[in-house]
Each structure stands twice: as structure tokens, then as C-alpha cells.
């Protein structure tokens, strides 16, 4: 999340500087992963590198460039031949469908709701698995929502912000206000956050946290206040006790509201737009899987089970999750399945994209691609007229007041932005005819990187050129400026 962050104060708050940047951390990590893989398997090249990316990156202007940045880092590694960036929920779906076939001996044919709650983002994605061509399985994204914005120094309202807020709450509870605020946000504080995460992971692994909550419930905070974890967390030379009431209070303040909101949205959209009632069992062709490191946290699982009405006899996780480790490794194992060709992704548009132009004195949005429609990779989709023919635009005029990205939910969720002056001039200069006439389209590459297509139109001959001029949009913020309401 921080790799695309333009607010320097947010980056510095997490102890990065001009040398040790989030991008540097990503480059170092990916280089080390490739090096270790080659050393383990005795290879000197990686034919196909599949990297998972949060689907929620598509839902915010500031993170739209994330996939291009990750792809470029991977392409800079000399021994990597091909790179593919895939949504993490799609990768998890591949692994769970594979698990289902191993457990039942039958291919999975249906829908999987992936709730990916990791350290930095929350992704809820409804995917469809079907037998595809060449005996491989195809995975299609049906619906997606989530939370992942960097706001108030919080990353994605997920595991990281929970750990940070919990430790800050513990410190404020025990230390004088001035002393507490001086400690919070320091390198010592973040070392304490890491220690706290280890304690909670160990408590869940050993069953201590689950057993205690199962016995006492999560509602009586007075009783839970007297019950503490065996280990204390050290920070700034102090030992801080962690009560079960602390775990619940911070969870209710930070996680529960946004998790509830996003689950409710997914339930509504799945039923309205796809006829899938995710709150009911449907003969085994609907599965629900909670994944990501934070997905092993008891309070997260309890909230999810309550929302979807899970019972002891429920089969919506049966056959796809064999043990709790599956929740953490589903994405990485799914990447291996896609890299090896066992699963293929059915290409769907990650968002709708269009331009708003003044037509007869009124602004009108004309879309080239619509959210989640099936598309062909690298196939351009143009603005068309009422007859479905490619529409001729004049790039010498004020041809695009705004660009628009949305998710089919109306203008309330649209991201509106303007092309910067230099970029509009660059596009116009790509058209060589005097009238600057052309058709305008977009495509998505293998890693969902947006490309703009311009095909010249000869007004005298009345025909389009045989090929397009293509301009890839790597970093959105370099060529576009977000319109704030």
C-alpha cells in the first residue's frame, strides 16, 4: 500500500526515509524470493513469475498504479522471463478449487466467496470456477469490494492497523498522556507491534485465545478485563499486559464496522446482480473462504461466521480448507497453480472506463469497457456511436473534459480525473493527420495494466488506419490528475 503513497508524512510515520523506501523494500523482498527459489530448485531462470496483488488496488486512484510498479520491479530482475500480476482472491480461488478436487475426486464447479483479510488490505471477491479450454480450469471474477486506503495513518483497516492501535491503546491505558504520545510512532513502538503480532499468533496457534473466548464469550468486557494473556508485550522498557477485553475493544473500534459494511455490500450485490445468496447453503456449489494472516484471528472468524450464519453442519468451507495453514498459504499456492497452467484466469474488466465530453452543451460519459465484462487480453475496445461503429474524435478540440473509472454502482463510486496538459498534447501529437481525427480506445494487458489505443482516421478517404498507436499508462498520477469533489 505504501509503495504508491504520495504523502511523505505517512511514509515517514512508518520509519521509511529517502533511502529505505517502500519501493526499496519491495525490490529487496522480490529479489530475495527469486534468488531463494532458484537456489532451492537449482535453476538459473524463472520462466513464469506470478505475483499476487490486492484487488482493492483498483478501487482507489492512488493505488491504480500498483500493479505496473510491481511488474516493473519483477521485470528488472535479470533471471525472470515472464511476469504476471494476478488478484490475490483469484489466486486463493485456484488453490481452494484444487483442494476441493483433491478431497472429493470431483472438479469444483461453482462460486467461491473469498474474504482476504491480510495485514494491509481487506478484499471480498466472488469468483466463478469452471472447466475451461485445454483441460485447465478458468477463474472468473464476478464481484469485488474491499478497503485499502491509507487514511489517518491507517493501512487498509486490516491486521496492521489493528496491531498498531491495540498497542497504542495498551500504552495509553498504562502511561501518562505525554509519555505515551512520545513513545507511540517511534521505532521502539513498531518493534513492540511486531512482538505483539507474534504473541497473538502464538496464542491462536496454541488454542489459548480461541479456548478463552469460547468459554467466556466476547460481550462481557468486565469479566474479560480480568482475563489476560500469558505473555506481556515489551515496549520502551515497559511490560504491558494484554487483557481479552483489550482485544475486543480495539477490534470493535477498528475492524468490526468496516468488516460489517463490506460483507453487507457483498451479500447485497451477489444476490442482486448474480442471483447468489451467499448466506445460504446451495448444494455444495457455493463455498466461502476466509484467508490471509488476519483471517486466523478468532474475532475475525467469529464475525464472519455470524454474518453468514455458519453452523456446525455448514458445508461452505468443507473440502476447500483442510487446516488453518491453508488460510495463509492459499494465495502463494494458487500463484504456483496459475504459473504452471493448471488454472487460467478468465479476463474481466477490473473497472469501467470512459470519457466525459461536452455533447450538445451537456457532459456525457461514453464508456469503452464496462466493469467485470469479459474481455480479451490486449484487445482494444473503442468508443462507439449509436450504430456500434468506432466513433471518430478530433483530438485538436476539447475532446475529453474528464476520464471516468467506476464499478457499475453509479456516480457515487466513480473516480473522476483529468488528463494533464502535457499528456493530452502527447496524445494529440500521436495523430499525424492535420485534422487530428482518430478513434480512441483502451485495453488491458496480462497484468491488468491499462493501455490507450489511438487509430487515425483519414477524413478524405473515409477510412481508419490499419494499426493503432499504443500508449501504456504505468503511473496514473504522472499523466492524470484526480478531480476532488
Label for each model-derived stretch:
Residues 49-66, 280-307, 323-328:
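Glycine-rich phosphate-binding loops at beta-strand->alpha-helix junctions
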Residues 83-115, 329-344:
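Conserved phosphate-binding catalytic cores of ATP/NTP-utilizing and phosphoryl-transfer enzymes
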Residues 1-12, 134, 142-160, 165-174, ...:
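Early-domain small/polar-rich strand-loop-helix modules and first-structured segments
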Residues 1-77, 162-214, 476, 480-485:
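Phosphate-binding loop and its immediate beta->loop->alpha context
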Residues 77-91, 304-334:
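Conserved phosphate-binding/catalytic loops in two-lobed NTP-binding clefts
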Residues 2, 77, 151-305:
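Gly/charged contiguous loops adjacent to phosphate- or pyrophosphate-bearing nucleotide/cofactor binding elements
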Residues 313-430:
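Acidic, glycine/GT-rich loop-and beta-edge segments that sit at the periphery of enzyme/chaperone cores
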Amino acid at each position: 500500500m505504501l509503495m504508491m503513497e504520495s504523502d511523505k508524512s505517512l511514509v515517514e510515520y512508518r520509519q521509511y526515509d529517502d533511502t529505505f523506501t517502500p519501493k526499496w523494500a519491495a525490490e529487496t523482498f522480490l529479489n530475495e524470493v527469486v534468488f531463494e527459489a532458484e537456489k532451492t530448485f537449482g535453476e538459473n531462470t524463472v520462466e513464469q513469475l506470478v505475483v499476487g496483488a490486492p484487488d482493492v488496488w483498483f478501487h482507489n486512484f492512488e493505488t491504480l498504479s500498483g500493479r505496473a510498479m510491481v511488474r516493473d520491479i519483477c521485470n528488472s530482475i535479470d533471471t525472470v522471463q515472464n511476469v504476471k500480476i494476478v488478484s490475490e482472491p483469484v489466486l486463493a480461488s485456484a488453490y481452494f478449487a484444487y483442494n476441493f478436487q483433491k478431497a472429493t475426486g470431483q472438479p469444483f464447479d461453482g462460486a467461491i466467496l473469498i474474504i482476504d483479510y491480510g495485514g494491509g488490505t481487506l478484499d471480498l471477491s466472488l469468483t466463478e470456477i469452471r472447466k475451461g479450454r485445454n483441460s485447465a480450469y478458468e477463474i472468473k471474477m464476478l464481484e469485488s469490494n474491499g478497503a485499502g486506503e491509507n487514511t489517518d495513518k491507517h493501512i487498509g483497516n486490516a491486521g496492521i492497523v489493528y496491531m498498531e492501535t491495540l498497542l497504542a491503546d495498551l500504552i495509553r491505558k498504562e502511561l501518562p498522556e505525554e509519555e505515551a504520545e512520545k513513545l507511540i510512532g517511534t521505532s521502539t513502538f513498531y518493534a513492540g507491534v511486531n512482538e505483539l503480532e507474534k504473541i497473538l499468533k502464538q496464542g491462536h496457534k496454541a488454542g489459548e485465545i480461541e479456548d478463552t473466548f469460547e468459554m467466556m464469550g466476547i460481550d462481557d468486557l468486565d469479566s474479560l478485563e480480568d482475563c489476560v494473556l500469558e505473555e506481556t508485550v515489551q515496549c520502551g522498557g515497559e511490560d504491558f499486559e494484554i487483557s481479552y477485553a483489550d482485544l475486543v475493544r480495539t477490534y470493535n473500534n477498528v475492524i468490526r464496522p468496516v468488516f460489517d459494511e463490506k460483507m453487507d455490500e457483498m451479500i447485497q450485490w451477489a444476490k442482486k446482480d448474480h442471483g447468489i445468496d451467499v448466506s445460504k447453503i446451495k448444494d455444495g456449489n457455493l463455498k466461502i473462504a476466509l484467508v490471509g494472516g488476519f483471517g486466523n484471528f478468532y474475532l475475525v472468524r467469529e464475525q464472519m461466521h455470524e454474518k453468514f450464519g455458519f453452523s456446525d453442519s455448514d458445508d461452505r468451507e468443507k473440502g476447500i480448507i483442510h487446516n488453518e495453514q491453508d488460510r495463509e498459504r492459499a494465495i502463494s499456492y494458487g500463484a504456483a497453480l496459475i504459473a504452471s497452467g493448471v488454472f487460467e484466469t478468465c479476463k474481466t474488466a477490473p473497472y469501467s472506463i470512459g470519457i466525459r465530453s461536452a455533447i450538445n452543451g451537456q457532459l456525457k460519459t461514453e464508456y469503452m469497457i464496462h466493469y467485470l465484462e469479459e474481455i480479451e487480453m490486449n484487445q482494444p475496445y473503442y468508443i462507439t456511436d449509436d450504430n456500434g461503429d468506432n466513433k471518430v474524435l478530433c483530438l485538436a478540440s476539447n475532446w475529453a473534459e474528464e476520464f471516468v473509472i467506476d464499478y457499475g454502482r453509479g456516480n457515487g463510486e466513480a473516480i473522476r480525473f483529468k488528463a494533464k496538459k502535457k499528456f493530452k498534447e502527447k496524445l494529440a501529437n500521436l495523430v499525424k493527420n492535420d485534422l487530428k481525427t482518430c478513434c480512441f480506445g483502451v485495453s488491458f494487458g496480462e497484468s491488468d495494466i491499462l493501455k490507450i489505443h489511438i487509430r487515425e482516421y483519414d477524413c478524405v478517404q473515409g477510412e481508419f488506419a490499419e494499426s493503432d498507436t499504443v500508449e501504456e499508462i504505468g503511473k496514473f498520477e504522472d499523466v492524470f490528475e484526480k478531480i476532488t469533489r
